[in-house]
From Swiss-Prot:
Protein's UniProt name: Phosphoribosyl-AMP cyclohydrolase
Gene Ontology biological process terms, A to Z: L-histidine biosynthetic process
Binding sites annotated in the UniProt record for Zn(2+): 84, 100, 107
EC number of this enzyme: 3.5.4.19
Cofactor(s), by name: Mg(2+); Zn(2+)
Species this chain originates from: Methanococcus aeolicus (strain ATCC BAA-1280 / DSM 17508 / OCM 812 / Nankai-3)
UniProt xrefs under InterPro entries: PRA-CH (IPR026660), PRib_AMP_CycHydrolase_dom (IPR002496), PRib_AMP_CycHydrolase_sf (IPR038019)
Location relative to the cell: Cytoplasm
Name of one Pfam family that matches: PRA-CH
Residues involved in Mg(2+) binding: 83, 85, 87
Length: 130
């Protein structure tokens, strides 16, 4: 299916965030572990659909980036879901290596302990694993 037709069928709702038209992109692995969340603009979505690999829009660098372009920890797209408002997309990906730039498998490795209000780090630092 051509990319424009795929985008038309998805009908994503890009929101104005800091003067840019963006949507939320959530990446999970095939075991349903939440890996990360980031923004996408329309070009990042098109590039993701064209290549089959996750591309995001960096608000801090003001550019599109391919996940893993420096680390090699790429995300291959397996499935795509849109939420009911169509302003967020959920991508099921095959994660190579780890997702987090802090070297954890998931970016969600900080846990607030509700009993003592302390932040705990969960998961293993992947650099130390190898």
């Amino acid at each position: 299916m051509e990319i424009e037709k795929m985008i038309k069928q998805l009908n994503p709702k890009f929101r104005n965030i800091d003067g840019k038209k963006l949507l939320i992109a959530i990446a999970i692995d095939e075991d349903k572990t939440v890996l990360m969340t980031a923004f996408m603009d329309e070009e990042a979505l098109k590039t993701t659909l064209e290549t089959g690999y996750m591309h995001y829009y960096s608000t801090s660098r003001d550019k599109i980036w391919r996940k893993g372009e420096e680390s090699g920890n790429v995300q291959k797209v397996k499935e795509i879901y849109a939420d009911c408002d169509k302003d967020a997309l959920l991508f099921v990906v095959e994660q190579k290596g780890w997702a987090c730039h802090e070297n954890y498998y998931t970016c969600f490795h900080y846990k607030l302990n509700l009993k003592n209000n302390d932040i705990e780090i969960v998961g293993e630092n992947m650099v130390n694993k190898y």
